Amino acid sequence: AMLAFAVLLMPRGDKRRRARALGAAACVLLGVGAYLGAYADEAVYGRTANDALINIWSDNEVYLSRGFALSFLHSVPELFPEKPEGYDARAAQALLESFPDEDIPEGEKVAVMGVMLEAFCDLTDFDALAGFDTVQEVYAPWHALEEQSLSGRLLTNIFAGGTVDTEWGFLTGASEHDEYCGATGSYVRYFTAQGYAAHYAHPGYSWFYDRERVNDYLGFDRSVFTENGFGELVDPYVAMWHSDQQLADYLLADLDAADGSPLFSFAVSYQNHGPYAETESTVPYVSPEASGWSQESCNMLNNYLFGVNETVREYVRLTQELDARDTPVVLVLFGDHKPWMGNGGSVYEEMGIDFDTSTLAGFRNYYATPYLIWANRAAKEVLGADFTGDGGDFSPCFLMTRLFDACGWAGPGYMQLSRAMRDISPLLHTNGLFLHDGVLTSVLSDTDRSFYRSWLAVQYYREHVAAYS
């Protein structure tokens, strides 16, 4: 039909103008109808899947497997992100510029190292597991490290997946984000503007979550993945269960190579990625006899705990290695989300965990992960702070802010704005939930709601409008 109408558009003299106009109008109507019909239909898009022939975790392979035309037209809405309510670019720019960037004092430019731990949570937070000595033993070194650190809980947006939501919240300070399509505001850019090198490491593939491209948009100088470094250190398949040793060693070597020059390094671990086998397990941390739970649930818990046991000890070793160095280093460790534990959270359900997210207790059970901010002796001396105590609970977008607070740094203007937002609510959840005076709520006062809208406008401006070199 499109070809037939195209013939009508071919130039054949003045007498054909009306026919060409009708053909053009028909093509437009047909095209719009096709787009609003089949091309925009999620069910049609779903039926074009070729999952058996591709890696379903690769966005590029998914895109190509469904055909360029369908994939492109289906992605058109991503090219036009929705602006926040009442968005005014000039007002957002003016608000952001009213908070000027503050430099890190020259004598205080300590190395900053961050590690986001895959599916890391403290299972002793759950009463159902806290009573097992075997489980307590797994987390005992972590609890000891918390006593030496500022520590608390991240109140994430995600459960059992979507790891980059927490990752990018930490790196950008944004409580929500759209698809990154170009250079965007980030704390990475602040570090490089302060004379830091900015390095990224992940013992997995660069195409996962399109991290290689996004990292360039965030401002990293260098990103190392399986394809350009870690593949020589650990097999990417094995890395899902055993790679924290290699990652910790890599971070130490990278720090040493900087030779005292300011370095911001950030790593995303891969060890303990789900799913966890339910047919067998090596170490019986929990058993059906002791717990009353099914063998399948116990196996999943045991396999997760086996990996976490190694993870905890590797990052305790990392702190010991850092403490033995003269280079001042501040380290932040945090989990991205709770681990997958069976379809529909079957293991959690069998354990009787409260996941009613309308209550604060259930919300924390579902979304909270641990974090700690630790400093070696050299950094404590340089910064004049002890880095211990209760760090508070908050959204991932406030974690870098808390780190700067601990260091005594004012930071970039956006971070100063974030402190004002955090004072209103340390929780900014994508489900529209806040934490006000310790109460989980979807309601803010008119004044606080107005500031929150301004905050969202600044985020949008910073991500989509502001220019970055």
Can you say where each PLM-predicted feature lies in the sequence?
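N-terminal secretory/membrane-targeting segments
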Residues: A1-K109, D133-L150, C181-G185, N309, ...
